[in-house]
């Protein structure tokens, strides 16, 4: 058992509650995940404290554990105000005002049997109203795990106690948008952040997404990274009214319960902690009504995450192409959610250090559905050993914030080899230089991209390749220079931090490649979508690759130039500023050519459909599921001919 201690931020939140409680007792209960030693008053205090911390962005126990504690208190005190009222927030965010309409909590069910009991109550209400039960429809939507709020078109309010909330309109003033740029005033919803965006860009800085959601509405200055997420549309207000849904007969629901629940659960790009089921008939809603806390015609279905306690065998350091050393926990093989799990990645070595992850540690891993397993907590910590040397080049590692980093950028095999792999993988026009051939060449001293292009056929032969293979490799290198490639793709192939394909394309809409290397932090930070922290990383990264970049650039690659923003804005095109995605086989030419043409007309071309996509252009052999998913997200689906008519 790892001993739990409230940190300073959590203690500050608890002080605002003004609860009279021995915090040491609460820390012990949280450590043990047991309330056996607490009195009823202490249990109530624990519920208030953990609820307050959760709503403030500092969750300390799992939802399922909180629900079990809540259920035990409710069993003994069913009429207590804490049980019968909406759980209130504790953050002092602004003026408290009456909500335009009540925002109640939702009752919960954890099994199909509980859902059947709820449906029986719906059927009973229908019979009492003389409604044909065969006509009863159930609507199911994802249960967003965000920050609940209400948008009346002019102001944004927190849920508060369900009757009164706090004015947090500052979130919209900071740039927060309604999902898919929908209109304001759609009522209740949640502030959420795109899961993939959080994992890729924010998880190393914030412990969980609730930290982000709370920060968006807080009175204090907002972290630049959060503002950048808002600018990029990763953080949005998602009204419940525009959620994707399944609506159908209750009998159909029970026939394919698991399949329907899974479909709805995975229909959004945000954290979801269940689905919401509700009767659609307004007569049934009015008849069943609500108590002080829940609507009786509505229920949330939640699935318990599958967890397992596993022993750590070792922690293996792996050096990435950026130089960061990632800890990988090797585990005693354990089956969870139908898969054999033997390793999990830990975010960074500071987590290893703080949480005590090392050989002999007992960790709890969790896997929700098909999600990659992660360490949820450490049950039995150990004193971990921190690596001092890079596992690849044996250079002494340095601490940079939470990360151990190898400073040997030019000679570390892992960094140079992975950089070469990344370059050829990103260019995607040369299948002879995969990881195996690159590893072979790197081991023989070919460390840089320009060195690879300097090789002659006889040198490949000297490195152990056959005569025919040597000629093929040489020919492929020469061909890769002649095949047309976008300038943004060429730049992104060098693997600079914060310079993926999307950001490269944005920057090259304002600068040529040569101009970009002269841009300052201030220049880049002024552009839409680039916060200062990103600008600093980009300028530093470009400086690091400048010499190598121009050695390769000067070899004469056939680069197509990204149209400049000023040119795009002057276009009178129906695609200007729109986000389009192409899918399926096209009849009028290659899909890649159509994508390039769409960009020239001012469109942004995506690789997958999201809630921000404007058009999905569907060619031949596109599955019905993909089409329906796009429509549920509010995306207009065009055939190839409809698209051509649009742009002609």
Swiss-Prot record:
The keyword Repeat does not apply. SMART domains: BRCT, LIGANc. Zn(2+) binds at residues 390, 393, 406, 412. GO terms for molecular function: DNA ligase (NAD+) activity; metal ion binding. Belongs to the NAD-dependent DNA ligase family. LigA subfamily. Keywords: DNA damage, DNA repair, DNA replication, Ligase, Magnesium, Manganese, Metal-binding, NAD, Zinc. DNA ligase that catalyzes the formation of phosphodiester linkages between 5'-phosphoryl and 3'-hydroxyl groups in double-stranded DNA using NAD as a coenzyme and as the energy source for the reaction. It is essential for DNA replication and repair of damaged DNA. PROSITE patterns: BRCT. CDD domains: BRCT_DNA_ligase_like. The keyword Phosphoprotein does not apply. It catalyses: NAD(+) + (deoxyribonucleotide)n-3'-hydroxyl + 5'-phospho-(deoxyribonucleotide)m = (deoxyribonucleotide)n+m + AMP + beta-nicotinamide D-nucleotide. The active site is at residue 143. NAD(+) binds at residues 63-67, 105-106, 159, 190, 302. It comes from the Bacteria. This is DNA ligase. The gene is ligA. Its EC number is 6.5.1.2. It is an enzyme of class 6 (ligase). Its cofactor is Mg(2+); Mn(2+). GO terms for biological process: DNA repair; DNA replication. Residues 570-648 form the BRCT domain. It holds the Pfam family DNA_ligase_aden. InterPro entries: BRCT_dom, BRCT_dom_sf, DNA_ligase, DNAligase_adenylation, DNAligase_N, NA-bd_OB-fold, NAD_DNA_ligase_OB, RuvA_2-like.
